[in-house]
Regions:
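Central cavity-lining transmembrane alpha-helices of secondary-active solute carriers
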Residues: 60-75, 281-294
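Extracytoplasmic gate region of multi-pass secondary transporters
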Residues: 37-38, 237-291, 349-352, 356, ...
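Juxtamembrane intracellular "pre-TM" segments in multi-pass secondary transporters
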Residues: 5-12, 211-242, 267
Length: 440
């Protein structure tokens, strides 16, 4: 575990929290753009003639494809250059790509636009995690990470609520004649509108200061890759245990999140507007409160001197998620399903602050963006790609019935949720060994 650097004072609290809030807004926008697709599965399928499996690839693989190719090199750049500027450019890029989704006239062009969204978003979180670790001391870092991760749920909720409201005014299956663009479907209009806020946010980000790096031993140069892999190899149980644990948790989150709107449509006959309003509010209140409370609980445990307090908070959340994720798709009424989905969002958000803070504490400053990119790569390959696709494959090829979607969701969660806890416990044991080695 890396001891705190002492060369410079920490930034003023007001400056640090302003940066955390602006970065949270960037994360919010990223998830608005990402989650909006889940609300539009049915109209896009109808217009483009896509299957559930094809839509799952559009939701997961298209985003991950360029994240894999772009995320790691951009993170390497972030470890040696201005992270704020990287984030500002990334926001601008994915916002243009989101608007391009509204211009798509075929599945192939929509897939290509989603690839560009992934390329842009690949520059956000690794740089943001690294910046936050230079803004906040160890006893406050988990809380700051929790605030940043609130963006996941704010973004998901905004996509659902605003998407539902827009769908009430401009039905996704309707056709509108727009100047220059001609006949445009309602779902395409939503993507065009979503591209606008990011351009403004990329300008706001310029008001955030790039924090001084808190390096150890006067080493201000980026670490060579050989040193990076040597550091990683000496702590592989910690890094891969935590990474796989969160990847499997996100597999459950993305696998359910991508299909929950379709779940309510198919099982309970809800409209797009009804889903957006009700499910969106659940995500907003439960997810954001979980991320905020979980981050502060982890910081409180860490501040009390409890060994691996950050991760103990996550262990509680992972454990509670197991029965909830398996049970919610099987509820006989939409109200019971929504109640359990609310609990699922709360405890999923509860876990992030402590887990992310642990990864930053475990890593030297000039390796943090690259480690964060590796973490994001893992959770996107396993979670973002496999989650929606796993549910779709079980629906299409195991049950062979779109109406059995709720069974497919429950089956997927019954495998992934317990495995996520096992991996996290392995990671915690690895952190304990790394701490003991650092004390020798």
């Amino acid at each position: 575990m890396q001891p705190p650097a002492t060369e410079t004072a920490w930034p003023p609290a007001r400056t640090a929290w302003f940066a955390a809030i602006v970065l949270m807004l960037a994360n919010t926008l990223a998830f608005v753009d990402r989650q909006a697709l889940a609300l539009l599965v049915q109209p896009i399928k109808q217009d483009l003639g896509a299957s559930d499996t094809a839509m799952s690839l559009l939701y997961g693989l298209s985003f991950t494809m360029f994240y894999v190719l772009v995320g790691l090199p951009v993170a390497r750049l972030a470890d040696r250059s201005n992270r704020r500027n990287i984030i500002a450019f990334s926001i601008f890029l994915w916002s243009i790509a989101t608007a391009a989704c509204g211009l798509a006239r075929s599945f192939g062009t929509l897939f290509a636009a989603r690839v560009a969204v992934g390329a842009g978003e690949g520059g956000l979180s690794p740089s943001a995690y690294s910046m936050l670790s230079d803004y906040f001391p160890r006893n406050k870092l988990a809380a700051a990470m929790g605030v940043y991760q609130m963006g996941i749920y704010l973004g998901g909720a905004m996509a659902l609520v605003l998407g539902g409201l827009i769908a009430g005014s401009i039905p996704p299956t309707s056709t509108i004649d727009l100047p220059l663009l001609g006949a445009t479907k309602g779902w395409q209009c939503l993507f065009l509108l979503l591209g606008i806020p990011g351009i403004l946010l990329s300008l706001l980000l310029l008001a955030v200061r790039e924090p001084a790096r808190r390096v150890l031993g006067g080493d201000h140069e980026v670490a060579p890759l050989s040193a990076f892999f040597r550091h990683l190899g000496g702590r592989k149980a910690a890094y891969f245990g935590i990474g796989l644990g969160f990847a499997l948790m996100i597999l459950v989150g993305n696998g359910t999140g991508a299909w929950i709107p379709a779940f309510f449509e198919r099982r309970f006959g809800w409209s797009t507007a009804e889903i957006g309003a009700k499910y969106g509010l659940i995500v907003f209140f439960c997810g954001t409160s979980g991320a905020l409370i979980g981050g502060f609980v982890a910081s409180w445990l860490q501040g009390r001197g409890i060994a691996r307090g950050n991760l103990w908070a996550a262990v509680v959340g992972f454990t509670v998620l197991i029965p909830i994720t398996i049970a919610f798709p099987l509820m006989p009424t939409p109200e019971l399903a929504l109640a359990l989905i609310g609990a699922m969002n709360f405890f999923a958000g509860f876990n992030f602050g402590g887990g992310l803070a642990t990864l930053q504490e475990l890593t030297p400053n000039r390796m943090r963006a690259l480690v964060s990119a590796g973490y994001m790569l893992l959770i996107n390959l396993v979670g973002a790609t496999l989650g929606p696709t796993a549910v779709a494959l079980v629906t299409d090829y195991w049950f062979r019935d779109p109406a059995a979607l709720h069974y497919a969701i429950s089956f997927t969660c019954a495998i992934a949720s317990p495995l996520s806890l096992v991996c996290l416990l392995i990671g915690m044991a690895g952190v304990r060994r790394a701490q003991r080695q650092a004390e020798l």
